[in-house]
């Protein structure tokens, strides 16, 4: 919930015209992102699998591309859909997902979020 909230707030702050689809692995995460300003929200495997097909960018924890991560909430179908979608993926190295990204200096979560959104804007030509 917290990471999604921070991502939605930062994207809306930097790109107020952006349409944000909050695709949560659980209803609390989805509700938190909607409350933070996401335009649409849905929860579970099928919304994630279907939702990433049309996305320009996907932002989230690194665990969204690892099956069974985030306490088992990421299904193999979700991980495959996110990893294989055409969208550019901007992933936050959150070690609680069970994945350690070597060489990444530990930073406060808001710093990672700001960097991910900045990189997304540059790569998608929004900066």
Regions found by a protein language model. Name each.
Residues 2-60, 64-127:
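A cross-family phosphate/adenosyl-ligand binding-site feature
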């Amino acid at each position: 919930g917290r990471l999604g909230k921070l991502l939605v707030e930062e994207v809306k702050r930097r790109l107020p015209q952006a349409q944000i689809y909050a695709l949560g692995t659980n209803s609390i995460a989805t509700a938190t992102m909607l409350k933070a300003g996401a335009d649409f929200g849905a929860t579970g495997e099928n919304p994630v699998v279907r939702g990433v097909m049309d996305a320009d960018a996907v932002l989230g924890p690194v665990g969204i591309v690892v099956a069974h991560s985030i306490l088992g909430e990421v299904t193999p179908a979700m991980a495959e859909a996110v990893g294989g979608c055409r969208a550019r993926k901007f992933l936050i190295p959150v070690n609680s997902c069970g994945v350690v990204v070597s060489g990444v200096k530990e930073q406060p979560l808001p710093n990672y979020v700001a960097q991910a959104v900045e990189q997304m804007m540059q790569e998608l030509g929004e900066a």
